[in-house]
Amino acid sequence: MKKLLLLPLAVFLFIQCLQSQQPAIEKEEWTSKPVIHAVSPDYQNEPAVIILDRRRLEFIDDSAGDVREYYTLHKIIRVNNDKGIEYFNKIYLGISDNTDIVDIKARTILPDGKVIVLDKNNIKDMKEEDGSVYKIFAMEGMVKGSEVEFSYTFQKDASYFGREVIQSKFPVLKTHLELVAPSRLVFDIKPYHCSPESKTDSTAGGKTILQYSLSGLEGLEDEKYASYTVNLARLEYKLAYNNATHRGERLFTWNGLAKKIYGNYTYYTESELKKIGSLVKSNGWEKLPNEPDQIMAVENYLKKYFSVRENIDDKDAYDIEKILKNKLASTMGIVRVYSSIFKTLGINYQFVLTADRDNTVIDREFENWNNGDYPLIYFPKENKFLSPTRMDFRYPWIYPSWGACNGLFCKSTSIGDFTTAIAEIKPIPLEDYHESYNNIESKINLNAAEDSLRIDMKQIFGGYSAAYLREGFNFSTEEQKQSIIKEMVKSSIGSESILSSETENAAFENENTFKPFILHAVVNSGDLLERAGNKILFKIGMAIGPQVEMYQEKARHFPIAIEYPHFEERTIEFSVPDGYTIKNPEALKMEQIYKENGEQTMGFVSDYKLTGNKLLVHIMEDYRKTVYPVSQYNDFVKIINASSDFNKIVLVLEKKG
């Protein structure tokens, strides 16, 4: 969280004023004389222990006939050491508007029984780089063994979908979620990665109360190669029925969302279609020989000349005619532009909504519309995708975390003259592993003085790997590009002594044709050499760049997550200097392979050939899946650490005879 601005903000008067206007909602009760809780010695080495995590979502009919939502969070936390104090000495609230606040309370309870109550005048605003605003307040007087207690309630427009992540790095002794709504509104709640006790109370004066409780939720740290957030315990909720207006009819289904999306994106005025027709004709897209060429031409044009901003409320950013004029679109607006162009060209396509698989999922059995955050366009004939809002990815490449997971496909269907869409939940495949790579080709020679190496190196990036680099190069100044090159070379072989460098295929359009991004550099380096008497020690293992080494003392919790399937191929050609021989070339032979049902899914293999004075080293490392189960963790570590072990290989060059 990058802090840009910290402004004092007195909220006390706002809270008092608002409280006088609130409908009757349940107030969070506090113990008038708090004492330090008894906590099991089993938790004494934890930086902090969350004694209570209580949340309440209450839906209320207001005087205007609208439904308002009130959200309450109440936590009590024991801090055991300096790390715990550092983590909880400031409390952040995701509330930006004072008029939304119903109540805020906080206090610190010291081991000697002293209580320090929050002065509400000390609540401040913190503005982020992206413009979002949080409220923040400091917990005063904290020492080891003290407890932090805070609660807040705020109101907002009702959201009929949501998720509450109830697990973090700290253990939680008691978790309680309560959802309160008028009895006509029937909510469903689904737990993920947890098994809470649940009960429903329909006797509370026209309200239904859903309660979910858990005890002893363990704290989980993030792990290397893991999707952390999506694997934490959470509760998702949605409005399933409104028995006052649609009794017995399930609301907010996936089919309902598909129809809504299709309707929003495929309604065009005659004037809009006329403008799009002129755009298509002026660019000659209808004359291109095939569908992929048309798709690529349209995408490259729109991403070159138009800007997209996610949260623009301006209706001009939705109107196709205004978008074509102003070159600025909202997310919905730019999808409408793509849709109208592909309609004009007669290209068959489907709208797709996807989630970021590291954070949440689109669940076929539970229709949480909030999880479908990101739009894609799918072309059934090619079985490929386009990402209309990601300027850094080009067909058929999409942001990797939006794939290898389920998506909502809006499949069009016609009844007479009426066309709509039905939902199909199915996987969004990523491109095959052999299309994405990070390769190195090096030719290495010892200089005449035998104290440094001349390395002629190519770093070759394809597929998803190339997209990130192209973004850096296309949105950078020349000075920034040189800095990127310098860092890439340094990270690869540890030297900044670059004699020459050039890049190839840096333009975004090269993604369409699968051309790799290439950095070609010639470098001098003495860091890979050492002398030991009359021997030369060549640290050839470092010529592939530093590799990850994995050791984990605790048991693995999460499945292994790879951002995208890929391989890394490295070839090294080393000219053995005259008069020398390599004493230990066999050190270059390594093999770690894992197979499922007889088919390789990951591996590391290195080998060599020695022909005359030419040493040719070939290394292949690959990961062909995005997820590996915990049961394969030890095998995964062996392969990851094989590349790290290769880093440590040192060839011994001895004088002949």
Language model features with spans:
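A surface-exposed beta-strand-loop module
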Residues: 104-167, 197-232, 288, 443, ...
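Bacterial Sec-dependent N-terminal signal peptides
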Residues: 1-25
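Cysteine-centered nucleophilic/redox motifs
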Residues: 75, 148, 177, 298, ...
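Long hydrophobic segments that form regular secondary structure
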Residues: 416-528
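Secretory-pathway-linked proteins and extracytosolic
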Residues: 22-36, 155-159, 163-169, 176-313, ...
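Early extracytoplasmic/domain-onset interaction patches
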Residues: 21-93, 430-459
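Hydrophobic/aromatic-rich core segments of domains that either
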Residues: 332-421
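Solvent-exposed beta-hairpin/edge-strand motifs
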Residues: 92-118, 172-189, 472-502, 568-594
